[in-house]
Amino acid sequence: MSDSRYKVDVSVVTRFLAEQSQPEQNRFAFAYTITVHNNGELPAKLLSRHWIITDGDGHVEEVRGEGVVGQQPLIKVGQSHTYSSGTVMTTQVGNMQGSYQMLAEDGKRFDAVIEPFRLAVPGSLH
């Protein structure tokens, strides 16, 4: 059973970056914009990120780091934090998923799950 005091939702919008990609060299660039929304009952600070990136061939890369794009935002109740970043893959299709480690105002650490989302070159999926 989840505790409603610690509820953070994550939404993602992705975009293929044709101008930064080199398909002939198996280089496919993607941008993603993420909104982290605090639906809990306490302000929470985003401490760190953990990404699992899987390309179309099944190769997996894990990325861990502090904050997001150099920030560790404090997200107040009912507020959100939006940022953009990107990744480069060697296949036209892949997916990302992971979590953010959050620190609530009362000192409790908890994970905000980032559900799997697809990265795909337009027209690459039938």
Swiss-Prot record:
Spell out the InterPro entries in the cross-references: ApaG_domain, ApaG_sf, Uncharacterised_ApaG
Identify the PROSITE patterns for this entry. Answer: APAG (PS51087)
Q: One of this protein's GO BP terms?
A: error-free translesion synthesis
Which PANTHER family does its entry note?
F-BOX ONLY PROTEIN 3, POLYMERASE DELTA-INTERACTING PROTEIN 2
The record ties this protein, via Gene3D superfamilies, to:
ApaG domain
Traced from the root, the source organism's taxonomic lineage reads:
Bacteria, Pseudomonadati, Pseudomonadota, Gammaproteobacteria, Pseudomonadales
Q: Can you name the source organism? A: Pseudomonas syringae pv. tomato (strain ATCC BAA-871 / DC3000)
Q: Which gene encodes it?
A: apaG
Which superkingdom heads the taxonomic lineage of this protein's source?
Bacteria
- Provide the ApaG domain boundaries: 2-126
Q: Name one Pfam family in it.
A: DUF525
* The protein's name in its UniProt record: Protein ApaG
- HAMAP family named among the record's database cross-references: ApaG
